[in-house]
Each structure stands twice: as structure tokens, then as C-alpha cells.
Design a protein with these regions (language model features):
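Positively charged n-region of N-terminal signal peptides that target proteins for export
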Residues: 1-5
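C-terminal motif of bacterial Sec signal peptides marking the signal peptidase cleavage site
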Residues: 15-18
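Compositionally biased alpha-helical segments
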Residues: 20-144
Length: 144
């Protein structure tokens, strides 16, 4: 009896803690995240889970226009824990933090780790699928 209860609690925990994934066509992404040459960025200060503060520039986007798996439009509140995953035409995936992703000329450049600040570039022409989700990491903006 206790074993069944523990299994039930485990399944419910997994179900409610999983991150919901949303989708975004490449065109919708480029409308929301234009090239850096055409937009004024805003300064934010974010606090990481350990309490360290980091100041950086972000696109002035309060909510991200995306779609659920059924194609229903959804607005996801932007924040420092939002992750964006690009799958290219060869099936390779790259995951960045949405607020640390930029479009420069014909490439998407993003930060893969807020701790190490690892950057990677992907040609826009090779992007096949874009997925967005709240990674539920304990990052938060403190100056908004």
C-alpha cells in the first residue's frame, strides 16, 4: 500500500514539475528578436540562485509569442529562466537562454550557460524547429 502511494506521489511530482514546451516558427522568432542593428536594448539586473547579481542588455520583450502543441497562440512571460532550443536541418540541438539570445546579421547568437557565458552561433537559414520553455531555474530580474 505504501509502495503504491509513493509511486503515485512520484508520478504526480514528475507531471507537475515538467516544463511545458511551446513552439515558434522562424518568422515569428525574427519578428520578436530583430537584428541588433535595428533595436534599442534595455539594461536588466538578474539574480542567480546563489544570490549573485549580473547586469546585461536584453531585447525589450515582456512576453514571447509562441504556440502550444495544438497550434493555439500563447504568450509566455519573458524572464531570465526562459530557454529557447533551436534544432537545425541536421537534427542538432542548441539551447540558449532567451534573454541572452541575439540576431546579428544572418545568425542567431546565444549564451548556453549563464555561469560560464558560453556563446554559440547558428545560421538562421539552417534553423528547422524552435522550442521555448520556462526552465524553472531560480533566476529573477531584480530591477523591473
Amino acid at each position: 500500500m505504501i509502495r503504491h502511494f509513493l509511486i503515485f506521489v512520484f508520478i504526480v511530482t514528475i507531471f507537475f514539475s515538467s516544463c511545458k514546451t511551446y513552439y515558434m516558427p522562424v518568422g515569428t522568432f525574427l519578428e520578436q528578436v530583430p537584428t541588433l542593428e535595428t533595436v534599442n536594448l534595455r539594461q536588466v539586473t538578474a539574480q542567480d540562485p546563489l544570490g549573485h547579481k549580473h547586469t546585461y542588455s536584453v531585447y525589450p520583450i515582456d512576453s514571447i509569442k509562441c504556440f502550444d502543441k495544438d497550434g493555439t497562440p500563447y504568450k509566455l512571460k519573458n524572464g531570465p529562466s526562459i530557454e529557447i532550443r533551436f534544432t537545425d536541418i541536421n537534427g542538432r540541438r542548441s539551447t540558449f537562454y532567451f534573454d541572452r539570445t541575439w540576431v546579428i546579421q544572418d545568425s542567431v547568437i546565444g549564451v548556453q550557460s549563464k555561469i560560464l557565458s558560453l556563446k554559440k552561433a547558428i545560421p538562421v537559414s539552417t534553423i528547422k524547429i524552435i522550442e521555448v520553455q520556462d526552465g524553472r531555474k531560480k533566476y529573477k530580474y531584480i530591477n523591473q
